[in-house]
Amino acid sequence: THFYHGNIIRFCNRPFEDVEMMNETIISNWNNTVGLDDTVFHLGDFCLGGSAEWTKILDRLNGKIYLILGNHDLKNLRQGYVDRFEHVTMQMHIEVDKQKIYLNHYPFLCFDGGYKDVWQLFGHVHTRKNNTGIDAARLQYLYPTQYDVGVENNNFMPVSFAQMKIIIEKQVEQLKMKEQ
């Protein structure tokens, strides 16, 4: 999400005039997608600034948020926001509807689990639809069971498990077609 990160607008060519517009759009999209009791896994680079900025954002977001730390989050560990999350960690393995999922801020070519049976969801890179954007060239070796859940790649909205399943199944099918 990169809340309060002014440079990300220019760096990633985000379609916002300023930080306030970006924050408000993402908060609105989030709350229109996520219910009060929904579980959210945020894959890092949540917010820049200190505990005041983090608190302003967290006070407005729906859901029970698990934070997988990103490179921009590490320096804020001491700021007092950690207790606002359900859990804060560097990585996480979860299972949803019998689907094993590995969560990390970074994409990995080697990760814990079988590449056909385990999904890997990540952030960090700033791609857009159809594998475009500033980091797209570096991602050409990803497995079809991996996906960038970052906001630039998902219309500045959270992605549900049902949406993920459709996306990853489509990526797997596209690879099968290419291999034939």
Model-derived features with residue positions:
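Active-site metal-binding loops of divalent metal-dependent hydrolases
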Residues: 1-3, 44-47, 71-73, 106-107, ...
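Core catalytic region of metal-dependent phosphoesterases/phosphodiesterases
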Residues: 3-96
